[in-house]
């Protein structure tokens, strides 16, 4: 299967997202090309990964690098959202500094979204910025979190509240890694693909409705979905790198979704990010309908598609008890899009007609949350 390349074109930095099977075998060439180096013998690499990816794929990557006489420093953290913390960040930083890696050396984030965010944030602050390469191993990371330069960790006050924009030198998305991805994780990544259609690509959403089963089977349709998703996000990031405008549209479903992740204490047994986004997108459409922005039939269509692939779509699908509406409101108030204490949501006027809604009434949001919680109690 042919390798595809999507280029992220920024004002001060351009980089490639390379997509296709068997890219680990080409990793050395891709890394040399992206770092503009003839050889890598004098460059050391911190391989930041998690316990799950390490057990499945780390030996393969290390063998490829070692074969080319490249020095590596593997750094393995616990798998899961809870590793996006100050404690784990400190561990990663200490390992890199103890190995005396320099600014001209490189951090490779080898894993899913958590590892990309964690490794990228470490690279951004060590020696005021090291070389950084993303090697995403999950669908969600390949089509979303590895693209665009967002890095960071969570706080007890909310998700992704501590971080930096720090673009990688390249993204190497080997689709073979998806063959070992648990179905639950694949579904979670698919939610972010659906998001791209709902934002402003109704034709893409309709294509997903017809082709989702092929995407869940390894083949050219899966690669096409990944490429189209990366291209869509790359185009938005190129126009708005630091999220001062339209890039906020990429947060469709995330205001409610991040609220739910924080409310469940980032417990992956209850909820993972893509699942939270799926529920969040349904909530965003329901809230839009409550504000008389859309016909309720669109909610049914969106929810039906997410359910068809096995994603949760309602609060009742989350195991365990959720906090009261007032507590959930305090979590929403910490959302990154809040400006001058005004709530900002990504809402919709129709299929593929999402927009940034500023100064949303807190009273309307609170009443909506109370209604949704009442439905499950």
UniProtKB/Swiss-Prot annotation:
It comes from the Bacteria. GO terms for biological process: amino acid biosynthetic process; aromatic amino acid family biosynthetic process; chorismate biosynthetic process. One of its GO terms (cellular component) is cytoplasm. InterPro entries: Dehydroquinate_synthase, DHQ_synth_AroB, DHQ_synth_fam, DHQS/DOIS_N, DHQS_C. It is found in: Cytoplasm. It comes from Bartonella quintana (strain Toulouse). Zn(2+) binds at residues 192, 254, 273. Catalyzes the conversion of 3-deoxy-D-arabino-heptulosonate 7-phosphate (DAHP) to dehydroquinate (DHQ). Transmembrane segments: none annotated. This is 3-dehydroquinate synthase.
């Amino acid at each position: 299967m042919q390798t595809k390349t999507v280029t992220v074109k920024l004002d001060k930095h351009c980089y490639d997202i390379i997509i296709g099977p068997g890219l680990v075998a080409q990793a050395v060439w891709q890394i040399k090309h992206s770092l503009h180096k003839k050889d890598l013998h004098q460059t050391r690499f911190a391989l930041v990964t998690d316990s799950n990816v390490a057990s499945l794929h780390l030996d393969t990557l290390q063998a490829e690098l070692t074969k080319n006489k490249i020095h590596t420093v593997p750094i393995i953290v616990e798998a899961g959202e809870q590793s996006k913390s100050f404690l784990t960040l400190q561990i990663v930083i200490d390992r890199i500094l103890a190995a005396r890696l320099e600014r001209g050396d490189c951090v490779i984030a080898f894993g899913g979204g958590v590892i990309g965010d964690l490794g990228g944030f470490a690279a951004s602050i060590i020696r005021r910025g090291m070389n950084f390469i993303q090697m995403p191993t999950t669908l969600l990371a390949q089509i979303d979190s590895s693209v665009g330069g967002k890095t960071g960790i969570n706080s007890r006050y909310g998700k992704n509240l501590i971080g930096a924009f720090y673009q990688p030198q390249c993204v190497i998305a080997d689709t073979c890694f998806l063959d070992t991805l648990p179905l639950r994780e694949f579904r979670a990544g698919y939610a972010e693909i659906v998001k791209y259609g709902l934002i402003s690509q109704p034709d893409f959403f309709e294509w997903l409705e017809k082709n989702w089963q092929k995407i869940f089977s390894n083949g050219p349709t899966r690669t096409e979905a990944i490429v189209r998703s990366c291209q869509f996000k790359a185009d938005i990031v190129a126009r708005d790198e630091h999220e001062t405008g339209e890039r906020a549209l990429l947060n469709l479903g995330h205001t409610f979704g991040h609220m739910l992740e924080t409310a469940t204490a980032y417990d992956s047994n209850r909820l993972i990010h893509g699942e939270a986004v799926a529920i969040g997108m349904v909530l965003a459409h329901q809230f839009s309908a409550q504000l008389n922005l859309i016909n309720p039939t669109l909610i049914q269509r969106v929810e039906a598609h997410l359910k068809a692939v096995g994603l949760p779509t309602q609060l009742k699908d989350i195991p365990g008890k959720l906090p009261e509406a007032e507590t959930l409101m305090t979590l929403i108030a910490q959302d990154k899009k809040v400006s001058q204490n005004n709530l900002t949501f990504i809402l919709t006027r129709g299929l593929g007609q999402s927009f940034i809604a500023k100064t949303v009434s807190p009273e309307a949001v609170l009443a909506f949350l109370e209604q949704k919680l009442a439905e499950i109690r």
